[in-house]
């Protein structure tokens, strides 16, 4: 009885090993095939963009018209908030960004807060 169990175990191990080896062979061949296909494809050459200084594929650099690139660059800056309009400050006369928020010191903040919360009484 024990001999038949031993034979059954060895048979099952050999079947498992065969299946594992076949999986391993299939996987390695597939990965080798993908590697050779991937390495045979043409690699893009990279060119630096004169406006931004970033490297991009040469085909994309050739296709972009300089006007379109400049326009999209300005639009990107405006979306990020980097494009600023400068206007003269009415109090100081110096130029500052249009979206500049005037800084308030602690005394001004305190007075604004207390004036809002105080009740006014009408004396008649």
From Swiss-Prot:
What residues span the transit peptide? Answer: 1-35
- Report keywords, A-Z: Mitochondrion, Transit peptide
Point out the gene that encodes the protein.
LEA37
Q: Where in the cell is it found?
A: Mitochondrion
Name where it mostly resides.
mitochondrion
The organism's place on the tree of life at top rank? Eukaryota
**One GO cellular component term noted in the UniProt record for this chain:** mitochondrion
What organism is the protein native to? Answer: Arabidopsis thaliana (Mouse-ear cress)
Record-stated family: Belongs to the LEA type 3 family.
Q: What is this protein called?
A: Late embryogenesis abundant protein 37
- Cited InterPro entries: LEA_3a
Q: What is the lineage of its organism?
A: Eukaryota, Viridiplantae, Streptophyta, Embryophyta, Tracheophyta
Q: Which Pfam families does this UniProt record tie to the protein?
A: LEA_3a
């Amino acid at each position: 009885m024990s001999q038949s169990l031993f034979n059954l175990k060895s048979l099952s191990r050999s079947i498992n090993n065969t299946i594992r080896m076949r999986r391993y062979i299939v996987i390695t061949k597939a990965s080798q095939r993908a590697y050779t296909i991937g390495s045979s494809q043409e690699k893009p050459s990279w060119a630096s963009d004169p406006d931004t200084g970033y490297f991009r594929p040469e085909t994309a650099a050739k296709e972009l018209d300089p006007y379109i690139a400049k326009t999209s660059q300005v639009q990107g800056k405006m979306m990020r908030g980097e494009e600023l309009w400068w206007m003269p400050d009415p109090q100081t006369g110096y130029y500052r960004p249009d979206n500049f928020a005037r800084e308030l010191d602690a005394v001004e903040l305190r007075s604004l807060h207390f004036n809002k919360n105080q009740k006014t009484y009408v004396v008649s």
